[in-house]
Regions:
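N-terminal secretory signal peptides that target proteins for export/translocation
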Residues: 1-10
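Second-shell loop/turn segments in exported
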Residues: 31-35, 49-62, 86-91, 130-141, ...
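A non-catalytic alpha/beta surface segment that caps or lines the substrate-entry region
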Residues: 34, 43-107
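Stable alpha-helical elements in mature extracytoplasmic
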Residues: 37-47, 60, 64-71, 141-147, ...
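Structural recognition of the beta-strand scaffold that forms the well-ordered cores
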Residues: 101, 111-115, 165-168, 208-214, ...
């Protein structure tokens, strides 16, 4: 991120039980009354970070993708991949990327999209000491994925007429200079979705709302309302509803005022895909794009604050 459909060509993403077992990720039984567990979510974050940096096209990204495919299938989701290819902005060589779609209750045509990027920036370019060093991306990369992994426990038993899709975007920040484009995966997804909406019958899949979760594990969490999300007339009600849930739950980390204008995956989803999508993000994170974006800067309590609010909001969809 930077401050301020379902395609018919989806390919089945590769995955293996051995990969899932190797990283020690267990899937809990679905439970209609299950509450979001911060410790479980943090364990997912740690296991993802144990893979090391996960930039698009890397071996660690391929391993992570296989792990996630197996995890979400075991949790009861219908998982598919949306593959696309871009050119490396430095060399012109092909880089293969893939968004992951996890469908819950695919028979329900009215749907909500919950998205997060699962790639990491190639380098910690804001690090004052080593801007070409190792970037693990615990908060900026792993936190949104870990949140969706724990949120999956409550999805099979979701007793609403609305289905839910998790979308894990590749290529959110495959960026080597300020000239390089961001949001490659969400832009591709939005274009495919928009094209499909023009040709499909009225009863086809339609996204009622979208929510992006990004950088949601900071130990000192503060989720201010993102400026675009409260300014766009079709996304402002989504923000109001989510922050109202936070207020009812007494989750003080959700601040009911706007602060930053942030370019993130919600922008192409809304501007290209016409999906009313808001951004849930803590942009007051001192370790952003540095070598210190590590699990020790994150907390399960923060993941639980955000995940618990989202789970209750989803359960309230009618």
């Amino acid at each position: 991120m930077m401050p301020s459909w379902k395609s018919e060509s989806f390919s089945r993403a590769a995955g293996g039980v051995a990969v899932c077992m190797a990283v020690g990720l267990a899937v809990a039984r679905a439970d209609e009354t299950a509450e979001f567990s911060g410790p479980r979510a943090f364990a997912h974050l740690q296991k993802i970070c144990d893979l090391g940096p996960r930039p698009s096209g890397s071996a660690a990204m391929v391993t992570q993708r296989a792990m996630l495919v197996e995890y979400f299938r075991a949790a009861g989701g219908t998982v598919s991949g949306q593959a696309f290819t871009i050119r490396d902005p430095r060399t012109g060589n092909a880089v293969h990327m893939e968004n992951l779609l996890v469908e819950w209750h695919p028979d329900r045509p009215e749907r909500v999209l919950i998205g997060a990027h699962y790639d990491t920036r190639p380098f910690p370019d804001r690090d004052p000491v080593d801007p070409k060093g190792t970037f693990v991306g615990a908060n900026d990369g792993a936190s949104g994925v870990a949140l969706l992994m724990e949120l999956a426990r409550g999805m099979p038993a979701l007793a609403t007429p609305v289905g839910v899709d998790f979308v894990l975007f590749d290529g959110e920040e495959y960026v080597f200079s300020q000239r390089d484009p961001y949001f490659l995966g969400s832009t591709y997804f939005a274009r495919q979705y928009a094209a499909g909406q023009q040709t499909r019958p009225p009863q086809a899949v339609r996204y009622r709302y979208g929510v992006i979760v990004d950088m949601v594990a900071d130990r000192d969490l503060g989720i201010w309302q993102e400026q675009r999300s409260v300014t766009w007339p079709d996304t402002a009600p989504v923000v109001d509803a989510i922050w109202a849930v936070a207020a009812r739950r007494g989750v003080r980390q959700f601040v009911p005022r706007p602060k930053y204008t942030i370019d993130d995956d919600h922008v192409p989803l809304r501007m290209i895909g016409r999906i009313p999508t808001c951004d849930i993000i803590d942009f007051d994170y001192p370790h952003w794009h540095t070598t210190q974006d590590l699990p020790e800067q994150c907390a399960g309590e923060s993941l639980e604050a955000v995940g618990g609010v989202l789970l209750e909001w989803l359960r309230g969809q009618r």
